[in-house]
């Protein structure tokens, strides 16, 4: 079988264009993992976030590893009212966490 591969996790904050349109979506990209099962948890300042989360099913990449994405939909007020947001990805018992912090300037 294929060797186990830990995921690469990238977390993107909302774009300034999106915030100007009164929306805020955080995107957590999870790529190059095997086997194709991951658990994604979102946190605001360390507290679990359940609402507004949408995670895609892992899909197989051309290199036979898997990729998935998770989206967290917020209002700009929610985004600005927290110090940090984290995307926590658990794969085969190991956890990768990426954090973004809202900047004051826009």
From Swiss-Prot:
Disulfide bonds join 28-87. SMART domains: IGc1. Its main location: secreted. Residues 7-101 form the Ig-like domain. Keywords: Adaptive immunity, Bence-Jones protein, Cell membrane, Disulfide bond, Immunity, Immunoglobulin, Immunoglobulin domain, Membrane, Secreted. It is found in: Secreted; Cell membrane. GO terms for biological process: adaptive immune response; B cell receptor signaling pathway; immune response; immunoglobulin mediated immune response. One of its GO terms (cellular component) is IgG immunoglobulin complex. PROSITE patterns: IG_LIKE, IG_MHC. GO terms for molecular function: antigen binding. The keyword Cell membrane applies. It holds the Pfam family C1-set. Immunoglobulins are composed of two identical heavy chains and two identical light chains; disulfide-linked. Constant region of immunoglobulin light chains. Immunoglobulins, also known as antibodies, are membrane-bound or secreted glycoproteins produced by B lymphocytes. In the recognition phase of humoral immunity, the membrane-bound immunoglobulins serve as receptors which, upon binding of a specific antigen, trigger the clonal expansion and differentiation of B lymphocytes into immunoglobulins-secreting plasma cells. Secreted immunoglobulins mediate the effector phase of humoral immunity, which results in the elimination of bound antigens. This is Immunoglobulin lambda constant 1.
């Amino acid at each position: 079988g294929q060797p186990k591969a830990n995921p690469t996790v990238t977390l993107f904050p909302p774009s300034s264009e999106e915030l100007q349109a009164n929306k805020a979506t955080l995107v957590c990209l999870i790529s190059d993992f095997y086997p194709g099962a991951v658990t994604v948890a979102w946190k605001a300042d360390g507290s679990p976030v359940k609402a507004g989360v949408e995670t895609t099913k892992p899909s197989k990449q051309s290199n036979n590893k898997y990729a998935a994405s998770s989206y967290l939909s917020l209002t700009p007020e929610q985004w600005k009212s927290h110090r940090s947001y984290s995307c926590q990805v658990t794969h085969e018992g190991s956890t990768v966490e990426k954090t973004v912090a809202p900047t004051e300037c826009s």
